[in-house]
Amino acid sequence: MSKSLNHLLQDARIWQGHKPQKHASPAEHTGYQVLDNQLGGLGWPKGALSECLLDSCGIGELHLVLPLMQKVARQGKTIFWLNPPHTPYAPALARAGVNTDQLVLVQTHDSADFLWTLENCLRSPVTGLV
């Protein structure tokens, strides 16, 4: 393994699922205690990227983030979807308590547009979730 990668993996801000979390950092409960426990007992880390790796999409993975989406919607913040693999089903989200007026779907044309959009969403004070 390269020296720079080794150095990066030692950073406390990088959490790896097979290692216990070293430092408590701000987090949002997932709504599922078992999942919180897998995420170091805290939930989704705030101000961080969380990636869910799945064998296939469309198997109910949105249920993992639905409690967070509900909370963000109650706070009046905007939920951005960047290049979602499928169009979210608005009636189901509305039934689950997510205000669909706060959802913004963005399809970018290339990686440069995607990164520009992501950066601006993350910088915006109206953003609750990307």
Where are these regions (language model features)?
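Detector for small/aliphatic-rich hydrophobic stretches
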Residues: 1-81, 91, 95-100
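Conserved inter-motif catalytic segment of the P-loop NTP-binding fold
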Residues: 76-129
